[in-house]
């Protein structure tokens, strides 16, 4: 056979630049991402003609090369602080795989005329909506405070089941009351403040039985 190398260009956003001809030529487009300060790397599929693009692979760079991380949830919760306010564990679906991730929130007094909102690893507009629901339904005066949301480990939570962990993390930081270390939250939050069930609940619960969210009780 003949091996052909096709050279493309990646723009500043990390996407394939120019016309989509290069993406149309191939069956699969994979992104290998990770924080340069850690040894962990995430493998994501932006295009996959033979399967889901929601699946992720987690790898660790060792002395003898890359090795698969068999339990990504344990890796993503590694180093989680005990008894800290503003943190909650979420159980989300990455394709067909349930994964535990830590959601952190910081609510603090603003120094600006208009309070700041920021979200890393979570949709910004969804975060603003959930904060509005929290303020209206729970009576928290977030309109006078800065609020920041961060998902640890480089994951991006873009499913309804991550709503409740975000709301709980924000409320925990606002009240400065820690959430129980062994508690994980799953649920969609509506505009009236109700909590709705999400899909694949049995799989998520099985993941929680396999990997404890508590840093004091790491199951393997």
Question: What residue ranges belong to the model's regions?
Answer:
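Conserved small/polar residues in nucleotide/adenosyl-binding loops
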Residues: 210-215
């Amino acid at each position: 056979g003949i091996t052909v190398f096709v050279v493309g260009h990646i723009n500043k956003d990390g996407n394939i630049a120019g016309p989509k001809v290069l993406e149309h030529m191939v069956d699969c487009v994979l992104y290998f991402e990770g924080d340069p300060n850690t040894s962990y790397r995430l493998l994501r599929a932006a295009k996959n003609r033979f399967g889901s693009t929601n699946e992720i692979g987690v790898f660790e760079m060792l002395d003898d090369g890359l090795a698969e991380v068999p339990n990504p949830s344990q890796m993503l919760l590694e180093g989680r602080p005990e008894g800290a306010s503003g943190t909650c564990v979420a159980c989300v679906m990455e394709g067909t795989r349930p994964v535990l991730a830590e959601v952190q929130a910081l609510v603090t007094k603003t120094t600006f005329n208009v309070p700041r909102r920021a979200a890393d690893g979570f949709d910004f507009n969804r975060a603003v909506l959930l904060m509005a629901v929290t303020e209206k339904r729970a009576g928290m005066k977030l309109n006078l405070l800065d609020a920041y949301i961060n998902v640890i480990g480089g994951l991006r939570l873009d499913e309804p089941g991550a709503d409740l962990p975000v709301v709980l993390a924000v409320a925990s930081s606002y009240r400065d009351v820690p959430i129980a270390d062994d508690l994980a939250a799953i649920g969609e939050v509506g505009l009236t403040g109700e909590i709705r069930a999400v899909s694949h609940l049995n799989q998520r619960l099985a993941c929680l039985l396999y990997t404890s969210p508590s840093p004091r009780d790491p199951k393997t």
